[in-house]
Amino acid sequence: MEEDEVKIRIVSATAADAAALADLFIGHITAHPEYISHGEIQMGVGEGFVQDGRLVTRPAPGAREKWMKSILYEMSDDAVSHIWKAVDDKGTLMGFCAAYIVGDADIRFGMVGDILVNSQCRGGGVGNTLLQTAIDWFHSKGIQDIFLESGKDNHNAHRYFEKRGFVHVSEIYKLMEK
């Protein structure tokens, strides 16, 4: 290993990590509102409004508290959801990934709810390692169909996911009352 190469360690996130994960997440969607997808809008973490005929997104008031409540709930049932964090050899948070199993006894699929890498750690394999960890977890649970969502203008993420075998499946629309 080269002297400046950072070792990536993937570990399960716990309730004790929720505040740090929330800080990373809220900091990112504040700086990059294009990350906000319909999932964040549905859970009240993000909001959208129409400006000049286009949907504009931003973090919603109380976003951090709403996101922490959601992530703590998801951490409570490892049978259907799991959150991992990537840390370096000093324990510094590099990123995280949240994965969920959706469906019933007959039809189940995997959903990568969030995957986010600290901007200083991008390009070093953190995202790939987190994503592969989630895919392996889904496969260990017998899940083959895996989906994710991404904000409509998050083009860098779209290219990233396409390079890793994901394909564009559909569009989501929200009624914006006049």
Predicted regions and their residues:
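Residue-level recognition of the GNAT/N-acetyltransferase active site
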Residues: 118, 151
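Conserved acetyl-CoA-binding loop-helix of GNAT-fold acetyltransferases
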Residues: 114-117, 123-136, 159, 163
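Conserved GNAT acetyl-CoA-binding A-motif
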Residues: 138-149
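Conserved active-site alpha-helix within GNAT-family acetyltransferase domains
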Residues: 128, 152-170, 175
